[in-house]
């Protein structure tokens, strides 16, 4: 008969409690309670009085449409007239608006986008002045929409669309196919 093989037994170390992280100890429970401050108030933004059951009553014809840089570029690619396309999409009169930041962004893009710049200088498109520093158009549009919820935002930028979707009651317009598409416009009118 052979000898029975004796293998070494691993992991026979006695377990000890970690007193710093063990939640069963009284002093650690007290530390957890002190971290939870009952006076901590949640920061809830003030909801506009124009919003009634998720419909923005401030948006009515003639619609004020804020235009982004890439919306103009996509309109040129798809050969859609901006003012006529907006009126066909919304079935009402609309006022296309462009901010100084969007114009500055178009000017920075250089001669490749000169047709878009020429289209943005169209007299039918009204120009809004900006009083803030910097020329980042996305931040400018989001800031303007947060101040006054009476605009429709026209953009094809996915990042800007995500930011605008977080703001309740603001419709989005984008270029889809060879026409404009609107999101979240109430059927009240």
Curated annotation (Swiss-Prot):
Pfam families: Fcf1 (PF04900)
Keyword Protein transport recorded: no
Gene Ontology terms: cellular component: nucleolus; nucleoplasm; small-subunit processome
Localization (cell): Nucleus, Nucleolus
Keyword Nucleus: yes
PINc domain: residues covered: 63-162
Keyword entries, A-Z: Nucleus, Ribosome biogenesis, rRNA processing
BP terms from Gene Ontology: endonucleolytic cleavage in 5'-ETS of tricistronic rRNA transcript (SSU-rRNA, 5.8S rRNA, LSU-rRNA); endonucleolytic cleavage in ITS1 to separate SSU-rRNA from 5.8S rRNA and LSU-rRNA from tricistronic rRNA transcript (SSU-rRNA, 5.8S rRNA, LSU-rRNA); endonucleolytic cleavage to generate mature 5'-end of SSU-rRNA from (SSU-rRNA, 5.8S rRNA, LSU-rRNA); maturation of SSU-rRNA
SUPFAM superfamilies (UniProt xref): PIN domain-like
GO molecular function: RNA endonuclease activity
SMART domains from the UniProt entry: PINc
Major localisation: nucleus
CDD domains: PIN_Fcf1-like
Subunit (UniProt): Interacts with FAF1.
Function statement: Essential protein involved in pre-rRNA processing and 40S ribosomal subunit assembly. Required for the early cleavage steps of 35S rRNA at the A(0), A(1), and A(2) sites.
Sequence similarity: Belongs to the UTP23/FCF1 family. FCF1 subfamily.
Protein name (record): rRNA-processing protein FCF1
Native source organism of the sequence: Saccharomyces cerevisiae (strain ATCC 204508 / S288c) (Baker's yeast)
Lineage of the species this protein comes from: Eukaryota, Fungi, Dikarya, Ascomycota, Saccharomycotina
